[in-house]
């Protein structure tokens, strides 16, 4: 209707997370999304409850291949869904991601502590 195009690239985690009731856990999904209305977004999703707020200046730890651990700010979706978070510093993240084969993201979850999600990104097609 608007004549615009959104672009997506997603990858599922190699490992599964297990959480207590009522959350199911399972594989996480890392999605890169570019839309005309809000630009580039990095979205991490799992059936759990992330603890990440831009108001508290929360961060996720990210490791690209065997490189050093890096910190990226994170924020919650505007609709307050707890099973999703947005990773800030999108351009820096994508620049590192394009050169990597493996990415490990560590985030904090409500009553579950910090958990790591590993992604094989060697075949991720993002332009």
Show where each model-derived region lies.
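A generic "folded-domain core" signal
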Residues: 1-127
């Amino acid at each position: 209707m608007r004549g615009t195009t959104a672009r997506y690239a997603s990858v599922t985690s190699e490992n599964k997370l297990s959480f207590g009731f009522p959350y199911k856990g399972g594989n996480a999904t890392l999605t890169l999304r570019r839309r005309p209305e809000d630009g580039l977004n990095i979205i991490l999703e799992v059936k759990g409850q992330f603890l990440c707020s831009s108001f508290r200046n929360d961060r996720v730890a990210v490791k690209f291949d065997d490189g050093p651990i890096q910190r990226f700010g994170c924020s919650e979706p505007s609709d307050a869904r707890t099973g999703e978070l947005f990773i800030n510093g999108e351009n820096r993240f994508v620049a590192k991601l394009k050169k990597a084969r493996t990415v490990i993201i560590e985030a904090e979850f409500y009553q579950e502590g910090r958990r790591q999600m590993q992604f094989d990104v060697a075949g991720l097609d993002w332009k």
